[in-house]
UniProtKB/Swiss-Prot annotation:
Ranges for region Disordered: 1-21
Taxonomic lineage of the native organism: Eukaryota, Metazoa, Ecdysozoa, Arthropoda, Hexapoda
Function: PPIases accelerate the folding of proteins. It catalyzes the cis-trans isomerization of proline imidic peptide bonds in oligopeptides. Binds to ligand-free TGF beta type I receptor, from which it is released upon a ligand-induced, type II receptor mediated phosphorylation of the type I receptor. Binding is inhibitory to the signaling pathways of the TGF beta family ligands.
Gene Ontology CC entries for this record: cytoplasm; cytosol; plasma membrane; sarcoplasmic reticulum membrane
Gene: Fkbp12
Entry-linked InterPro entries: FKBP-type_PPIase, PPIase_dom_sf, PPIase_FKBP_dom
SUPFAM superfamilies associated with the record: FKBP-like (SSF54534)
Native source organism of the sequence: Drosophila melanogaster
Keyword Cytoplasm in annotation: yes
Stated name of the protein: Peptidyl-prolyl cis-trans isomerase Fkbp12
PROSITE patterns: FKBP_PPIASE (PS50059)
Localisation per UniProt entry: Cytoplasm
Similarity remark: Belongs to the FKBP-type PPIase family. FKBP1 subfamily.
C-alpha cells in the first residue's frame, strides 16, 4: 500500500518540501486499534527532520513531501513504509499499519 495521505486541513497550496530541505512538523502516531504511541503535541515540541535522507520512516519521507506548509493530514503507513516485520520493541508490534496525524509547520 505504501503511504496514503488523507487531508484534514488545507495548507498554503504552494510551499511543498523538496529533498534535502528541513521540515518542522507536529504529529500524533496511533496503532490500528487507536492506541497512541507517540506525539510531539503532547511534548509541546515540534519534530524536525530532513526530507529524503532516511532520517524517518519511508511513509514520512514520501507523505510529508506531499503536504504544503500549514496543511494537516493523516498519513496511513503500511508496515513496509513504517517499521516492517521488526516493529519497534515495546512500542510498535511487528507488521503494524500506522496512522500519523501530521501538520507541516515549516520548510527550511
Amino acid at each position: 500500500m505504501g503511504v496514503q495521505v488523507v487531508p484534514i486541513a488545507p495548507g498554503d497550496g504552494s510551499t511543498y518540501p523538496k529533498n534535502g530541505q528541513k521540515v518542522t512538523v507536529h504529529y500524533t502516531g496511533t496503532l490500528d486499534d487507536g492506541t497512541k504511541f507517540d506525539s510531539s503535541r503532547d511534548r509541546n515540541k515540534p519534530f524536525k527532520f530532513t526530507i529524503g535522507k532516511g532520517e524517518v520512516i519511508r511513509g514520512w519521507d514520501e507523505g510529508v513531501a506531499q503536504l504544503s506548509v500549514g496543511q494537516r493530514a493523516k498519513l496511513i503507513c503500511s508496515p513496509d513504509y513504517a517499521y516492517g516485520s521488526r516493529g519497534h520493541p515495546g512500542v510498535i508490534p511487528p507488521n503494524s499499519t500506522l496512522t500519523f496525524d501530521v501538520e507541516l509547520l515549516k520548510v527550511e
